[in-house]
Amino acid sequence: MAKALDGKVVLVTGAGGGIGRDIALMAASEGAAVVVNDLGASLKGTGQTESAAQAVVAEIKAAGGDAIADGGSVTDPEAARAMIEAGVKEFGRIDAVVNNAGILRDGFFHKMTYEDFDAVVKVHLYGAFNTSRAAADYFREQEGGALVHMTSTSGLIGNLAQANYAS
């Protein structure tokens, strides 16, 4: 019996843990080949190791799926392009991008530093743009593709000490 994502290739950012991991595992279980992107950074976005992405790839492969790991930063347009191109090179196409990468740098607005505000906006806003834009040319050439942008209710109703996260 055909699965919903048979033959599709999906990039999931922030897929080394949490919701991103579950999305990557679900996509693979539905037949997609998955590009598992994660820096392996802390929730604050510090540190870096590809082991989180590699662990999810190992889970997918152990379950009979197909996946590759990517440790690039969504904040870097060239790294975003490279993660899309890695999927195309390995699997022949890219069909969907799930922009799930995120960090937290909570702080009361009057105490928040520019660096903390900027770091969150770079991951959440520019990161989603960078990966989506990198995929757009392929989607146009293929005459189709899907962008999924994860968000939080903090952006709709706000939350204490999350001005940067809500933006």
Predicted regions and their residues:
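Substrate-binding pocket helix/loop in short-chain dehydrogenase/reductase
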Residues: I60, F108-F109, D116-D118
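The beta1-alpha1 cofactor-binding region of Rossmann-like NAD(H)/NADP(H)-dependent oxidoreductases
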Residues: G71-E85, Y114
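Residue(s) in the substrate-gating loop at a strand-loop-helix junction
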Residues: S152
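A glycine-rich helix->loop->beta "capping" turn
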Residues: A63-D66, A86-N99, R105, G144
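Canonical Rossmann dinucleotide-binding motif of NAD(H)/NADP(H)-dependent dehydrogenases/reductases
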Residues: K3-V35
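Active-site loop immediately N-terminal to the catalytic Tyr-X3-Lys motif
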Residues: H110, I157-A166
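Hydrophobic positions on the long internal alpha-helix
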Residues: M83, V98, T131-A135, H149
